[in-house]
């Protein structure tokens, strides 16, 4: 799961609410500027941020396939919120060719199911802004037939 440092606690809460166990920061995207010749620095809340973490969380006892997968990813910025494609390749190298899905995706990727309001998938309905509520910590009240159920993936 991609996260940002100012929202890290929310990411960890969501992992727990979905029934996963947080293990580590799997990847650290070191953002290069679009030309790839320097580094991007955001405005930051405390310090001028550059990196974005991708967290690893598990259910069950999955086995690591490769011990040679590095954590650092040096890659240029893309369009807003689009993540480096090479992280998908690193995930497959790390865990093997298992069924996988990218939630909140912006594009299709070979070998991956994708879901998100900008992904080339069936229409995604708007949802309450509080992801933890969606995950079952609190059930929002909605009138019957107001919203189609979420697609089963």
Can you say where each PLM-predicted feature lies in the sequence?
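Class I S-adenosyl-L-methionine
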Residues: 1-153
